[in-house]
Amino acid sequence: MGLTSDEAKIIINTLGRNPTEAEWLIFEAEWSEHCSYKSSRAWIRLLPSKSPLVIRGSGLDAPIIRINNIAVTFKIESHNHPSAVDPYDGAATGVGGIVRDILTTGLRPIALLDNLHLGSLDNQRSLWLSRNIIKGISDYGNRIGVPVVGGETWFDESFNNNPIVLVTCIGAGDFKRVIWGEGKVGDLVLVVGNDTGRDGMLGSSFASRELSSSDDIGAVQVGNPLLEKLLIDALMELGERGLVKAIKDVGGGGLATALSELAHQLGLGIEVDLTNIRLRDELKPEEILVSESQERMIIVVDPSRLSYVEAVLRKYEVGFDLIGKLTNDGKFTAYYKGIKLIDLPLDLITNPPEPIRKYTEPVYLMRLRRIPPLPSVKFNEALIKVASSPNLASKEVIYTQYDYEVGVRTVIKPGRAGATVLRLLEEDGGDGKLGIAVKADSNPRYSYLNPFTGAANSLAKAYRNVASVGAKPIAAVDSINVGNPEKPDKYWYFVKTVEGLTWMGNALGIPFVGGKVSFYNEDSVTGASIKPVVAVAVLGVVNDYAKAIEGGLTGEGWLVIIGDTGPELGGSEFLHSVHGLVAGEPPEPKPLSEVKNANLVMQLINNGLAKAVMDVGVGGLAAALIKMSIIGGVGFTVDLSKAPLTQGLNDPVTVAFSETNARYIIETSNLKETVRIIEANGVPYGVLGESGGGIVQFKWGGLELASLSVDDLVSINDSLRGVI
């Protein structure tokens, strides 16, 4: 049993009796870290969550953001433990689960993003995990007709046995289509979708402890994307016709969690008969409760509309079971073949005790934060190593496995810019011009060296990416993935992460409208913990998606850097790929500069002065320029000494690879007007050089640092092809 002895005592004392076997399983599921957030909820309440655009924030399956007459929702989820045991099904069902969370709002899922944190490419098990995770996402996403339009892929040896698999889903539709979640006593409760089987048994409990072995494969769910597609279509019609009052995904914890949370959210009770549930396998009633078989949802309907609901479900060949009704007693009551199995107060089920966890900074960090003296390195050799490193290499071999254009909404495709841009259609309630941009970012090395700074920088990076295409950032969701919360030096990472997100969110004016916390990302045999993954997805609004800007050079302009560059190599890709180090203090977060510089970039884009824009992040100025060159197939000549430098910086290698925040590269054909606007905004800038031709050339004053053809650069950057 996944409950502590203290938790078991609380349950027995509150009930005044010993729970039944079925009741124990409900508590094990609902009081797990995965479902209850018992070790994190006190901290995540600190995150800023309010904005005039946020109609409903975190706490339910998915938030609601209003943009004029359009409702937009987005959410991020993790599927780490299942993907470590069965990578194909673990990743695939991660896609299915997040799509169903979006469906609970009544809005159509329109796009997916994946953030993958995978192990070393020279480790055979890690390579096997990576290939199957990517294939699982590809197969499921392609078959349900929801495009995978963007993402991020990190490689690090700490993810060899414990990959971090995150999926974000975006939904949109007319604001009038939103299903807010209502119900009254006597309303009927149905399970719709898949049959209930043995797969995913107590998966929530499995996800709330350290990984052990492949013996846990029975806790991994198995997906059916074709059924999910039918479920999407059926729920869209039910919502459009106003036949559904509330929807709840059957996810972690199975029916035990879904039914109890739904009734509690409605402020009512619920009574169900498990005898009525279709089974794929022969199951005990207790197993029916905690099975996490996929493609299942709970819907609440008015009794007078049941026949219409049944007709729609039959039309799409989606199975359904009428299992119960809402009551006024505030209890979860369940029967099986006439025997009462469950009689529990919902307030007890849904309010587990919150343990007070100790936290302390790991002693090894003091040593790691000092960068040792570095041997000298030739600029061109460093450039090639950084450009070919797995983290900066082209991810084309990954995203071309995904269908990213289905649905006719994708304006800026994967690999073309800092963020993906999607058009909102007139059927969504828009004017045919409105669009949204979205990007999710993380940096495990930053978060490992300093979780406060790492978290703040994850939000800042996603904020810059969204601004770089011309979108105004309006909201964020986060996914925090760390080790065992019972270990003070691991829980410290979580606490400092939340503090960093809170600080930066308040400073940028960005509300967090949802998120996910995943603990126990450790190998129980070795005790090794992952580098913390703090992924932040930022959503932005584009008033006219036709004005959104890609990152590829056109060869028709000057290259201008916006923002200061300082000597900030801590946690950088340069240190790791060239010197084999993860050390130093990550770049200082600069929220005031982030806001000021982002507003300037958006102004330049809206005024039609930017031909191409790329924010500066991992790999520094050199990496940003390389990306722009490869995307556009165009060369450039730049003088790095022309960048605005701070702290007496005069080393070309540091200037090229420093990862100082709040910086962008702009290509413009109207240098005079661009400079006028930049100077009017009081933002540091430098004119680095020009784009054009087929050669990439870096200089420092009159000294040539490196020169290579764009074709050679493309080959160097394509280092993952044939590997993953």
From Swiss-Prot:
Binding site for ATP: Y37, K75, D478, G515
GO biological-process terms attached to the record: 'de novo' IMP biosynthetic process
GO molecular function, one term: magnesium ion binding
Major enzyme class: ligase
EC numbers on record: 6.3.5.3
Amino-acid positions noted as binding Mg(2+) 2 in the UniProt annotation, renumbered to this chain: D101, D249
Localization, UniProt: Cytoplasm
Record pathway: Purine metabolism; IMP biosynthesis via de novo pathway; 5-amino-1-(5-phospho-D-ribosyl)imidazole from N(2)-formyl-N(1)-(5-phospho-D-ribosyl)glycinamide: step 1/2
Catalytic activity: N(2)-formyl-N(1)-(5-phospho-beta-D-ribosyl)glycinamide + L-glutamine + ATP + H2O = 2-formamido-N(1)-(5-O-phospho-beta-D-ribosyl)acetamidine + L-glutamate + ADP + phosphate + H(+)
Positions annotated to bind Mg(2+) 1: E77
InterPro entries attached to this UniProt entry: PRibForGlyAmidine_synth_PurL (IPR010074), PurL_linker (IPR041609), PurM-like_C_dom (IPR010918), PurM-like_C_sf (IPR036676), PurM-like_N (IPR016188), PurM-like_N_sf (IPR036921)
SUPFAM superfamilies attached to this UniProt entry: PurM C-terminal domain-like (SSF56042), PurM N-terminal domain-like (SSF55326)
Active site: H34, H79 (proton acceptor)
This protein's UniProt keywords: ATP-binding, Cytoplasm, Ligase, Magnesium, Metal-binding, Nucleotide-binding, Purine biosynthesis
Gene Ontology CC entries for this record: cytoplasm
Residues where substrate binds: S78, H79, N80, H81, R100, Q221, E292, S293, Q294, S518
Family: Belongs to the FGAMS family.
Subunit-level organization: Monomer. Part of the FGAM synthase complex composed of 1 PurL, 1 PurQ and 2 PurS subunits.
Record PANTHER family: PHOSPHORIBOSYLFORMYLGLYCINAMIDINE SYNTHASE SUBUNIT PURL
Name this protein carries in UniProt: Phosphoribosylformylglycinamidine synthase subunit PurL
Species of origin: Caldivirga maquilingensis (strain ATCC 700844 / DSM 13496 / JCM 10307 / IC-167)
Lineage: Archaea, Thermoproteota, Thermoprotei, Thermoproteales, Thermoproteaceae
